[in-house]
């Protein structure tokens, strides 16, 4: 009898642990998230969850800025509760999510005890594609004469982009004492999947811009003060820093040659390897959307400051 009495609780604990592990497992992996506030437009975020020693760990890429680690996560009554940490107001932000099946998430973002935006997520696609055998001849995305094929986005009423002297220029000079944020970005009207991009840029001292691949992955242009290498010239923003010892060389023309196939990107700057077929885990801050399986435009960041100049923008795509 004693053996049976001892065995029953042990068996119950084992069953509960197994169920909890199964409940957690369906939430693990990378998720492309869309956040829909009560007013305003939906915007993208991204999340990755892993499990280590029975503990859920992870990271989140918010709407802007760099990714950060979550402060905790647990599965409660079949729901995933992700603690994102406090917002500026001090309220704790949590995501409460369910997984109804088919690799999707639904839920709500809570600020303290108050329900906020609704959440929807899909499993991030693998995007595992082989390198194309042949590419098309490079063609210009900017003719140097006008903005045909490009359109401002964001704060379009404060568009500073002009075509001047064969260059695509964000004419938004830095004013001492002002952040000069709020000008428009600009994107191509055409969308692309896999490609080879050539682009040249001249970023002044103190300038800040970015080249967004498929509108989702930022190749950093300029500097954010040198404190974080992954925020400096040539970084895949917040994911991969430039090579050790790389110089920003602001105020000079520099070229980028970018090959993006699936989720893997190679970046050369002035012919020097910066990123060799590295995996892009997910969108960076400032992405237009989180629809990673879809083609997307190029977009150039203009909502910071500095007279950023681009030229000689060409693209090749896989031959069909």
Describe each PLM feature range.
Residues 8-16:
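Bacterial N-terminal signal peptides
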Residues 1-9:
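Bacterial N-terminal signal peptides that target proteins for export
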Residues 17-21:
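Sec/Tat signal peptide C-region and signal peptidase I cleavage site
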């Amino acid at each position: 009898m004693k053996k049976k009495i001892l065995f029953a609780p042990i068996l119950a604990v084992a069953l509960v642990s197994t169920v909890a592990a199964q409940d957690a497992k369906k939430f693990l992996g990378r998720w492309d998230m869309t956040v829909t506030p009560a007013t305003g437009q939906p915007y993208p975020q991204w999340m990755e969850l892993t499990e280590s020693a029975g503990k859920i760990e992870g990271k989140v890429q918010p709407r802007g800025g760099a990714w950060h680690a979550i402060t905790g996560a647990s599965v409660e009554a079949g729901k995933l509760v992700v603690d994102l940490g406090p917002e500026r107001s001090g309220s704790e932000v949590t995501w409460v999510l369910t997984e109804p099946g088919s690799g999707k998430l639904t839920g709500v973002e809570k600020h303290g005890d108050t329900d906020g935006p609704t959440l929807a997520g899909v499993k991030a696609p693998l995007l595992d594609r082989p390198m194309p055998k042949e590419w098309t001849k490079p063609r210009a995305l900017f003719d140097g004469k006008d903005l045909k094929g490009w359109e401002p986005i964001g704060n379009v009423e404060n568009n500073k982009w002009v075509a001047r002297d064969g260059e695509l220029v964000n004419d938004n000079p830095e004013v001492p004492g002002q952040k000069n944020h709020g000008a428009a970005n600009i994107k191509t009207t055409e969308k692309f999947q896999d490609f080879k991009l050539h682009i040249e840029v001249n970023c002044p001292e103190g300038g800040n811009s970015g080249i967004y691949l498929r509108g989702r992955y930022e190749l950093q242009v300029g500097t954010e003060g040198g404190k974080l290498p992954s925020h400096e010239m040539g970084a895949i923003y917040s994911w991969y820093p430039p090579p050790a010892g790389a110089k920003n060389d602001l105020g000079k023309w520099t070229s980028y040659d970018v090959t993006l196939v699936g989720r893997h990107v190679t970046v050369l700057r002035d012919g020097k390897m910066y990123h060799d077929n590295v995996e892009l885990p997910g969108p960076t801050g400032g992405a237009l959307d989180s629809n990673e399986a879809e083609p997307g435009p190029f977009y150039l960041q203009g909502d910071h400051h500095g007279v950023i100049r681009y030229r000689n923008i060409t693209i090749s795509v896989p031959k069909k």
